[in-house]
């Protein structure tokens, strides 16, 4: 009995909507072609065989105090037996919180998708108490574009640079201690920010404690974050009992990392050509998220919800829906392996010899 085609607006579409909901993305998916996707090719992301699932997986770790970010990644590599893993933004040893760890194929885009805003909760200790109104007044001065020079103990060159602080909220203030919530651009040094605030106040200050509560699309209240002992227990259960249910909970499909990036859904017939370096032409577009803008980054996805890679949109969402020919997306980073979908383009025959 032949396998039935999967409705393009069925399981794959539901998975994409679930991915979008992680970061509150409510943009609509606008369909150009209402066609099915062939179940013989590719996988629904949550139904991949375990070895494939791990190759395209991520773990959102609640980093404990003590180990470095690199040590956390090394432990996860050893536990899972994967060859490659990488994290989405370094946390100092004493700092806790959200640390996304990409596995295997997902390491190709982790730096790109995580290089966005980050959010922290910070305990700042003033060296002398000040009036709360004065503190709030100075905190406002540090919203917007600020100048920073990396600390002495830093892995990057100590050159003056600008960073954007989107919001600083004073949550509590008691005696010399201020609890702050800071939403800022990636690469902002919180320790230096506290020191500069103390300098402007005229009393001095330093960072006492720090926790990252969001990086890119992942936050501590998303329901995706796990502890290292959760990972260890899931691996033991898998290796000793052959049960992978817990492992599939702690490792999530890497597609969640692009929940905030506008999406272009690709027809089955165009997927394999993208993995071979081709650009995406208008006839290969099945659907477009309404937030796609010309010149912006897009996530290329199959109708099953698999991430093919990232690209630069050469047309707006409406233009992609209306176009019948021409290149509409130029891929910048492909993560999907070759051979999951059929070759649908014609091979160019070599000219006959004279």
Curated annotation (Swiss-Prot):
Residue stretches making up the PUA domain: 261-336
GO biological process: box H/ACA sno(s)RNA 3'-end processing; mRNA pseudouridine synthesis; rRNA pseudouridine synthesis; snRNA pseudouridine synthesis; tRNA pseudouridine synthesis
SMART domains reported for this sequence: DKCLD, PUA
Highest rank taxon of the organism: Archaea
Pfam family of the protein (one): TruB_C_2
Active site: 92
CDD domains per UniProt: PUA_Cbf5
Gene3D superfamilies: Pseudouridine synthase (3.30.2350.10), PUA domain (2.30.130.10)
SUPFAM superfamilies linked to this entry: Pseudouridine synthase (SSF55120), PUA domain-like (SSF88697)
Keyword Isomerase annotated: yes
Reactions catalysed, as given in the entry: uridine(55) in tRNA = pseudouridine(55) in tRNA
GO MF, one example: tRNA pseudouridine(55) synthase activity
Keywords, in A-Z order: Isomerase, tRNA processing
Known EC number: 5.4.99.25
Function summary: Could be responsible for synthesis of pseudouridine from uracil-55 in the psi GC loop of transfer RNAs.
Family: Belongs to the pseudouridine synthase TruB family. Type 2 subfamily.
Protein name per the record: Probable tRNA pseudouridine synthase B
């Amino acid at each position: 009995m032949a396998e039935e085609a999967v409705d393009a607006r069925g399981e794959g579409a539901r998975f994409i909507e679930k991915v979008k909901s992680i970061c509150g993305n409510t943009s609509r998916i606008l369909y150009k072609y209402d066609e099915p996707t062939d179940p013989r090719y590719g996988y629904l992301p949550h139904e991949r065989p375990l070895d494939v699932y791990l190759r395209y997986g991520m773990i959102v770790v609640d980093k404990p105090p003590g180990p470095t970010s690199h040590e956390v990644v090394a432990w996860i590599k050893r536990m899972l037996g994967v060859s490659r893993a990488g994290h989405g933004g370094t946390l100092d040893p004493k700092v806790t919180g959200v640390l996304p760890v990409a596995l295997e194929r997902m390491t190709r885009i982790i730096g790109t998708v995580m290089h966005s805003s980050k959010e922290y909760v910070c305990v700042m200790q003033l060296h002398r108490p000040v009036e709360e109104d004065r503190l709030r007044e100075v905190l406002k001065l540090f919203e917007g574009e600020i100048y920073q020079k990396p600390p002495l103990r830093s892995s990057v060159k100590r050159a003056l640079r600008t960073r954007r602080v989107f919001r600083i909220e004073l949550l509590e203030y008691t005696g010399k201690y201020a609890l702050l919530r800071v939403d800022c651009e990636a690469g902002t040094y919180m320790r230096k920010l506290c020191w500069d605030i103390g300098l402007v106040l005229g009393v001095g200050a330093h960072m006492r404690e720090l926790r990252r509560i969001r990086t890119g699309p992942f936050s501590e209240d998303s329901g995706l974050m796990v502890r290292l002992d959760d990972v260890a227990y899931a691996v033991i259960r898998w290796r000793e009992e052959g049960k992978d249910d817990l492992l599939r909970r702690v490792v999530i499909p890497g597609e969640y990392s692009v929940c905030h990036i506008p999406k272009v859904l690709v027809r089955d017939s165009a997927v394999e050509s993208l993995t071979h370096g081709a650009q995406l032409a208008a006839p290969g577009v099945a659907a477009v998220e309404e937030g796609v803008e010309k010149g912006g980054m897009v996530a290329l996805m199959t109708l099953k919800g698999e991430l093919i890679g990232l690209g630069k949109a050469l047309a707006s969402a409406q233009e992609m829906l209306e176009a019948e020919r021409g290149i509409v997306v130029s891929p910048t980073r492909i993560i999907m392996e070759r051979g999951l979908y059929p070759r649908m383009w014609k091979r160019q025959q070599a000219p006959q010899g004279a």
